[in-house]
């Protein structure tokens, strides 16, 4: 009786662990962070030129892509022409447009 109860408990734990690991929507943020390029952690860089171009950067602290004003030259890698490029490269979503 005790042995069958122990076996049943172990089987249930294994089943629950398997279900939890294979559940869609399970937190994969650590995997995304591991695959994110290092330049996604850099702050936005306007550059020395005076143009006023709207670009996107990945805000690592907030966890999403935001806009910033780019001067037009000497861009760094965390500088994207579209929100889609930013999200594809660094992950996250499109954030508020407060920086315009």
From Swiss-Prot:
Ranges annotated as spanning the membrane: none
Keyword annotations: Disulfide bond, Protease inhibitor, Secreted, Serine protease inhibitor, Signal
Domain BPTI/Kunitz inhibitor: from-to ranges: 40-90
Residues of the propeptide: 22-33, 100
InterPro entries associated with the record: Kunitz_BPTI, Kunitz_BPTI_sf, Prtase_inh_Kunz-CS, TFPI/VKTCI-like
Chief location of this protein within or outside the cell: secreted
Marked site (Reactive bond) residue numbers: 50-51
Disulphide linkage map: 40-90, 49-73, 65-86
Compartments, record wording: Secreted
Segment forming the signal sequence: 1-21
GO molecular function: serine-type endopeptidase inhibitor activity
A GO term from the CC aspect: extracellular space
PROSITE patterns, per database record: BPTI_KUNITZ_1, BPTI_KUNITZ_2
SUPFAM superfamilies listed in its UniProt record: BPTI-like (SSF57362)
Protein name: Spleen trypsin inhibitor I
Source species: Bos taurus (Bovine)
């Amino acid at each position: 009786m005790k042995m069958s109860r122990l076996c049943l408990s172990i089987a249930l734990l294994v089943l629950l662990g398997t279900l939890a690991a294979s559940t869609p929507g399970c937190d994969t943020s650590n995997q995304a962070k591991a695959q994110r390029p290092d330049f996604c952690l850099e702050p936005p860089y306007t550059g020395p030129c005076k143009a006023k171009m709207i670009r996107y950067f990945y805000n690592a602290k907030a966890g999403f892509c935001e806009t910033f004003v780019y001067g037009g030259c000497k861009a760094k890698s965390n500088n994207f022409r579209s929100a889609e490029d930013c999200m594809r490269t660094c992950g996250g979503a499109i954030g508020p447009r407060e920086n315009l």
